[in-house]
């Protein structure tokens, strides 16, 4: 969140600025129409919104947990946009009452931070997704997703300028991917995993359903992309629940290494090392796409998702990335960056002029 302040703002010290910023956040939260406190949680600020979402503060940051919905529908997008609208309406009231110029919210996945030695580092939060699935499919759910999520980066990434090493910047598919270090893990703030093992069921533990907690994906602005990735993940869970088995010969040898390499090399021609052979990124996507096409019956949204997934893969194959502007975050950002770099005759490694 950025705040365009009144005169005198720049004369404040860091502690005063932090306190002032927090007062703005608290003011925004107080102006949001809350339904009820979110029982069972012990955070300082934790409420349900009218659309069923939950809003709370964590480490002095406003976070919104979207309302429960059926994955594979448009409900997730509707709830997410509703939460954004509620937040923006409250912010506009604060802008007017405090005579600020503006308050801007950014849906991002990384930010500046410090390590234990006080060095500047990039920190990440990403987007957490929880899915309920039939417990009997637990093993295959993990097997499918741990292999498919690396291949989903060009579908799910929000785009990022990443400092590969000092002074060397590259464009990546994802803001989140380079911060993933393992397949399974409990911690969300460091040594992050593709699948988080904080998976206690959100329902009756004896109901036959388990919770899948994914912390590996980016939050995205393009509604189409958010819907697409959510629905594809839903289809992968359906495959596991309905008995599809990913053959061992088609599993990745090094999923985490593949995520990092694919992301930083920003290459749609990337090939994965499988147990039995090498397979291109696009063909590996087709392996899962063809399996999902065999699911019966398919809803209207599921059919639409499969059609769009295939259309995007064909655009990847033809290198027609600009055709995805407005549909995929990373493609949209890359289009804008390329245009600006051409206009100013600069590169990603050009020094930023001080204003």
Give residue spans per PLM region.
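Extended amphipathic ligand-handling, pore-lining, and cofactor/metal-binding catalytic surfaces
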Residues: 173-174
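Long amphipathic N-terminal alpha/beta scaffold segment
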Residues: 165-167
């Amino acid at each position: 969140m950025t705040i365009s302040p009144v005169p005198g703002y720049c004369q404040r010290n860091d502690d005063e600025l932090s306190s002032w910023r927090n007062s703005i956040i608290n003011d925004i939260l107080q102006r949001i129409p809350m339904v009820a406190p979110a029982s069972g949680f012990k955070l300082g600020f934790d409420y349900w919104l009218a659309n069923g979402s939950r809003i709370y503060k964590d480490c002095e940051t406003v976070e919104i947990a979207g309302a429960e919905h059926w994955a594979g529908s448009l409900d997730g997008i509707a709830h997410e946009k509703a939460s954004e609208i509620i937040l923006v309406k409250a912010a506009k009231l604060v802008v007017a009452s405090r005579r600020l110029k503006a308050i801007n919210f950014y849906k991002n996945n990384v930010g500046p931070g410090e390590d234990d030695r006080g060095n500047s580092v990039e920190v990440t939060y990403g987007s957490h997704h929880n899915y309920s699935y039939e417990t009997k499919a637990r093993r295959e759910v993990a097997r499918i997703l741990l292999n498919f999520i690396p291949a989903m980066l060009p579908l799910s990434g929000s785009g990022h300028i990443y400092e590969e090493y000092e002074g060397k910047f590259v464009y990546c598919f994802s803001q989140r991917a380079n911060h993933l270090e393992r397949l399974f893990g409990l911690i969300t703030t460091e040594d992050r995993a593709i699948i988080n093992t904080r998976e206690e069921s959100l329902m009756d533990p004896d109901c036959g359903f388990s919770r899948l907690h994914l912390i590996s994906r980016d939050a995205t602005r393009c509604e189409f992309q958010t819907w697409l990735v959510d629905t594809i993940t839903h289809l992968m869970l359906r495959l596991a629940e309905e008995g599809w088995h990913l053959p061992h010969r088609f599993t990745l040898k090094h999923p985490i290494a593949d995520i990092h390499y694919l992301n930083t090399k920003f290459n749609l021609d990337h090939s994965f090392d499988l147990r039995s052979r090498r397979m291109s990124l696009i063909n590996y996507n087709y392996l899962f796409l063809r399996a999902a096409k065999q699911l019966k019956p398919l809803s209207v949204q599921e059919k639409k998702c499969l059609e769009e997934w295939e259309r995007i893969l064909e655009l990847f194959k033809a290198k027609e990335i600009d055709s995805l502007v407005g549909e995929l975050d990373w493609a949209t950002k890359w289009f804008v960056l390329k245009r600006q770099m051409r206009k100013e005759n600069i590169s990603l490694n050009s020094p930023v002029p001080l204003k």
